[in-house]
Amino acid sequence: MARLRLTIAYKGTDLHGWQVQEHATRPRPRTVQGVLEPIVSRMAGEQVRLHAAGRTDAGVHADGQVAHVDIPDHKLGVDWQKAINAQLPDDICILDVRRAADDFHARFDALGKRYTYRLWLTRRFIPPKLHGQVWATGPLDVYAMDRAARHLAGTHDFAAFQNQGTDVTSTVRTVHAIRRCPSGTLPAGALLTCSEPYTSWRCTGTHPDQPPATAGHPLAGIGLELVWSFEGDGFLKQMVRNMMGLLVAVGRGALAADDVPGIMATLDRSRAPATAPACGLTLSEVYYPPCDYPYAR
């Protein structure tokens, strides 16, 4: 048998996550694994199982999901990427297929992951191409969010940011970097550029303690897509969405940035704000050795 490594992108809007739901009543919910495995099995001539780096939830997107699968040696000559893509629906795409070491594991060999979360800072109008891919929050105090994010970076017990559903031996995780970056929808001359990791905070063009936008400010009164990036060695169930929910609560003024350490110290999920919607979240990249991941162990 030979092991293949697949890099996969998908729009999660009409998908019920990655994992096939074998015990669900028929018709089974449509999942990424449930779509891919029958195709790859037919091509391999036998039943196969795909193992992913992370099991994304319903509605979550990916442009850098990684999975591995074992196929018979005599099938190595097949153009797997082209052949699989020819059979896929429009919301799933294979970006790359390559042979991997026999002991490569998409989940356990990962050094870290990067997730992105997209916010739309007005509720008045969302461009059609962004429907199902952003959280329309309305205006936010991004500078207060910056201050709150600094409390989340680093190694902490994130029990207050874990939803139930997955057994883990420890809720301690390391968030190496949280950054916010404006997308191409920002107006010319806007103040924000992609920030440095909060572990070594530096804000380009403005100070993180600057007051929120007011009338006439480049960030005020306009529709903006704002992208947050979270990098870490691993994340608990819905941890990124829960951190995003907290940051938005701070941005709306429902919490103060300095409330974050106290919430984290409770280790109590009920003390943290509600989970952010799945629609804004994307699994953007999974890092494996050898690579230039700056936080490699």
UniProtKB/Swiss-Prot annotation:
Signal peptide location: none
UniProt entry tagged with the keyword Repeat: no
Function statement: Formation of pseudouridine at positions 38, 39 and 40 in the anticodon stem and loop of transfer RNAs.
Cross-referenced Gene3D superfamilies: Pseudouridine synthase I, catalytic domain, C-terminal subdomain (3.30.70.660), Pseudouridine synthase I, catalytic domain, N-terminal subdomain (3.30.70.580)
Gene (UniProt): truA
Assembly: Homodimer.
PANTHER family: PSEUDOURIDYLATE SYNTHASE, TRNA PSEUDOURIDINE SYNTHASE-LIKE 1
Name of the protein in its database record: tRNA pseudouridine synthase A
InterPro entries xrefs: PsdUridine_synth_cat_dom_sf (IPR020103), PsdUridine_synth_TruA (IPR001406), PsdUridine_synth_TruA_a/b_dom (IPR020097), PsdUridine_synth_TruA_C (IPR020095), TruA/RsuA/RluB/E/F_N (IPR020094)
Gene Ontology biological process terms, A to Z: tRNA pseudouridine synthesis
Catalytic activity reported: uridine(38/39/40) in tRNA = pseudouridine(38/39/40) in tRNA
EC nos: 5.4.99.12
Keyword tags: Isomerase, tRNA processing
The family this protein is said to belong to: Belongs to the tRNA pseudouridine synthase TruA family.
Active-site residues from the entry: 57
Residues that bind substrate: 115
Pfam families reported for this sequence: PseudoU_synth_1
A GO MF term: RNA binding
